[in-house]
Amino acid sequence: WYHDRLYNFGFDEAAGNFQNDNFGKGGSAEDPVLAECQDGSGTDNSNFSTPPDGTSGRMQMFIFDFPTPNRDGSLDATIVLHELTHGTSNRLIGDGNGLIWDEGGGMGEGWSDFYALSLLNSSNAFPPTAEYVAGAYATYQFAGLTDNYLYGIRRFPYSTDNSVNPLTWADVDDITLN
């Protein structure tokens, strides 16, 4: 589903998409995404390693072990789509090597959240002022919190309503920017 939607947006063979057979349409073939569910090499996170076109991307989704019972990150659609979008943006910018600095990583996080949340929302389901939460299932009651289903993996849900998400540029920590 994600592959087909992004293909329609232009992430096709020539752009470096992830697929086994490129059907002679450009790019390098034999590079499907290797999705590892319940990967045992970590907890409470997920990631996507993006090599250049022609080599499979590796998506690892871990168990979130702070909620009780544990929750599987691969069952949270926002996490899966978020990680797949890291693969997309990393392939499109520098063929796997373009978003390696702090600013690029920050942009990648934002794009990945945006695509995950927008692909799961129909155009008229909710207004921009609604609350859009990334990682709500996997992080529910994470570390003893009882209301983080409203926040997920971010400090506030995404929204254009300042009473829902009050963050502005003034909230950026200038120490981390130096």
Tell me the role of every PLM-derived stretch:
Residues W1-N178:
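Extracellular zinc-dependent metalloprotease catalytic-domain scaffold
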